[in-house]
């Protein structure tokens, strides 16, 4: 049997920019954030509660829905902010917003916390910690174009 070995060049690290890494981390955070809320609808009794105008201990009002949308909008906006702001401001904003969302993520576990919610919270916390780490260690010299 004659097998030819094809010589392939070694894989090359492309050096992804920090701001693109941050945008990717915020995107992952958003997917988890949204899916936890979506899967919440499959929990027994939750749709009935929503139809009666309650979510957890809160009445479903315009104010509640505005606050819920605002809490989702901030991480969604961070995807764009991470690639649009200048480095110095970008670094600060990412560290501050991620730090604020750490306790917020934990507070979302108040009351009834199912295993899928605990798993998502752990994954969200890991993503938020990576956001803080990458922003904190932002390179002084640009490594990408």
Regions found by a protein language model. Give the residues of each.
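Hydrophobic transmembrane helix segments
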Residues: 29-62
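Membrane-helix boundary connector in multi-pass membrane proteins
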Residues: 90, 102-120
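Interfacial helix-start motif at the membrane-water boundary
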Residues: 57-74
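Cytosolic juxtamembrane helix and N-cap/initiation of the first transmembrane helix
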Residues: 2-32
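Membrane-water interface at the C-terminal end of transmembrane alpha helices
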Residues: 126-145
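Juxtamembrane helix-break-helix junctions at the cytosolic face
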Residues: 72-92
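Structural signal for membrane-spanning alpha-helices in multi-pass inner-membrane proteins
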Residues: 79-82, 105-108, 131-135
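Central hydrophobic cores of alpha-helical transmembrane segments
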Residues: 93-101
């Amino acid at each position: 049997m004659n097998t030819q070995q094809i010589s392939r060049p070694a894989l090359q690290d492309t050096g992804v920019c920090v701001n693109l890494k941050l945008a990717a981390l915020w995107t992952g955070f958003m997917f988890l954030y949204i899916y936890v809320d979506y899967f919440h609808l499959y929990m027994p009794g939750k749709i009935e509660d929503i139809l009666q105008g309650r979510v957890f201990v809160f009445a479903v009002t315009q104010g509640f829905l505005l606050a819920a949308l605002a809490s989702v909008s901030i991480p969604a906006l961070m995807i764009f902010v991470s690639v649009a702001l200048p480095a110095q401001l970008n670094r600060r904003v990412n560290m501050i917003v991620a730090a604020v969302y750490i306790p917020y993520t934990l507070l979302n576990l108040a009351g009834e916390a199912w295993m899928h919610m605990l798993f998502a919270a752990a994954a969200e916390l890991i993503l938020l910690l990576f956001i803080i780490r990458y922003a904190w260690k932002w390179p002084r010299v640009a490594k990408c174009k």
